[in-house]
Amino acid sequence: IHQHLDLIAGLPYEDYDRFRQSFNDVYQMEPEQLQLGFLKVLKGSRMYDMAETYGIVYRRKAPYEVLKTDWMSYDDILKLKGVEEMVEVYYNSHQFEQSVTYLMHFYKAPFDFFEDLAAFYEQCGFGKVQHGRMQRYDILLQFAEERHFGKVVNDMAAADKKKDIQEVHGDAIEILKAIMLYDLYARENLKSRPEWAQEILYRPLCEDFYRNREMTERYLPSYAGCTARQMKRMTHMEGFAMDIRATAMSGQWKGEPEVLLFDYKERNPLTYAAKMTAISVSECTAEMGEEANG
């Protein structure tokens, strides 16, 4: 079931903190789309008649949106506009699913993450220009390096006396880079890897996979008749030192090394993500070894 939920800001009796609570409540429902909107004061409506009573100031031209109320200031509305943009880009697009899931662990509530990211965009002037998909990833990484992790590293290091601050910071950033790479390949078979991407892990195993008929028949049955080169071009294999999804869900390094197979011929109809199959490194090694011995 496709779940699309709307939140309207600027309603009477709802202040900024109450809206934050409503956002967090709705976010926990994990809708496919979370749409933030702003109260429209249309002529002839009940809200139009009560605007003065509620202290509602609104645009006199389309889209007639609220600018402030007795409970929410103009600055509050502007901040929520920023949150709306971040939710649209980083949540509703489904292009950053695991990255956002991971980063959520460093905030008390989902709203706080989007609010902080919006403030970072404003601080750096990023909201004034259009950005491509790869640029959005670069900004998210910059956000983590310069703002987000800088706040939590001290607490994490204090909790683990055996690690110094740089080590904890580095671990968190490297985990994020791996998760971001996962999100990128989930949507697109990249022609070139981003500069921040990890080294290609298990390259020999990935190369041998496409030449192993038993493996391709098992994991890529719809590519029967294709050559190894054709399968390699239409799919992607990426090795990771961890279980990406388990790590993103827990906020900590989880699982054993694995190779993920991204099949772009089969996609999720709602998120457009490629079909992903996890193959353990031990399984790959065993299969390739048997073929070599045979």
Language model: regions and residue ranges:
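Radical SAM enzyme core and accessory elements
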Residues: 85-294
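A structural motif corresponding to the C-terminal lobe/cap of the Radical SAM core domain
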Residues: 1-113
